[in-house]
C-alpha cells in the first residue's frame, strides 16, 4: 500500500471536507496509485461553489489542480492567477487533457448531467455538485455512463450527513418545530 491518496479515495472523501463520504460505501478500486503518483484534477465551473469545493479538496494530499474550465474567461483567469493550470473555455477541451484524472463539476444545475456524462466518456472520475440531475432520464444516463466507462461518480450531499440538518428534519417530522407550512 502506498502513502499517497488513491484516485477513488480522493473522490469519496472530497467536497464539504468529506463529511458525506464517511457515510458512503467504499467503492472498489480499479487502479491503485503509487506513492509518487498525483491525481490531476480539473475544475469545471469555478464559480462561488466551485471555489468552495476547491478549498475543501485542498485539505487532501496526493492531488493537484491541473486545469480549469469556465465560459467566463475573466473568472477563469482570476481563479488560475499565479497557477500553472491549463485554462479551457470549453469543458470538452479540459476533458481531452491527459493530465486530468478526475473532475469537479460545479456548473449551473442544468449542466451537471452533460458535464458528468462527457467526463465519464473521457475516462475521468467525477465529483458533481447537487443536484446531480434535473430529470430521471438524465440520472439514468449518468449511471449508464459511469458503469459503461468504469468511472466513479459522486454527488455532493453534505447537508444530508450533517447532524444539525438531520436533527432539524427530525424536529419537523416529530412536530417539535410546530406546524410547518409552505
PLM regions: where:
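N-terminal glycine-/serine-/threonine-rich beta1-alpha1-beta2 phosphate-ribose binding loop
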Residues: 1-128, 137-152
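A contiguous active-site-proximal alpha/beta segment in oxidoreductase catalytic domains
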Residues: 125, 133-182
Amino acid at each position: 500500500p502506498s502513502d499517497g491518496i488513491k484516485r477513488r479515495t480522493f473522490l469519496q472523501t472530497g467536497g464539504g471536507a468529506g463529511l458525506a463520504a464517511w457515510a458512503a460505501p467504499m467503492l472498489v478500486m480499479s487502479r491503485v496509485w503509487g506513492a509518487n503518483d498525483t491525481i490531476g484534477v480539473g475544475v469545471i465551473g469555478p464559480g462561488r461553489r466551485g471555489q468552495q469545493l476547491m478549498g475543501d479538496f485542498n485539505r487532501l494530499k496526493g492531488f493537484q489542480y491541473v486545469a480549469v474550465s469556465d465560459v467566463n474567461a475573466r473568472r477563469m483567469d482570476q481563479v488560475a492567477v499565479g497557477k500553472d493550470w491549463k485554462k479551457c473555455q470549453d469543458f470538452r477541451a479540459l476533458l481531452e487533457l491527459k493530465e486530468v484524472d478526475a473532475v469537479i463539476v460545479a456548473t449551473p444545475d442544468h449542466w451537471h448531467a452533460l458535464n458528468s456524462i462527457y467526463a465519464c466518456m473521457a475516462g475521468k472520475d467525477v465529483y458533481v455538485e447537487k443536484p446531480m440531475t434535473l430529470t430521471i432520464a438524465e440520472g439514468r444516463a449518468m449511471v449508464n455512463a459511469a458503469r459503461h466507462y468504469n468511472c466513479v461518480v459522486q454527488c455532493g450531499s453534505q447537508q444530508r450527513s450533517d447532524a444539525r440538518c438531520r436533527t432539524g428534519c427530525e424536529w419537523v417530522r416529530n412536530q417539535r418545530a410546530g406546524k410547518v407550512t409552505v
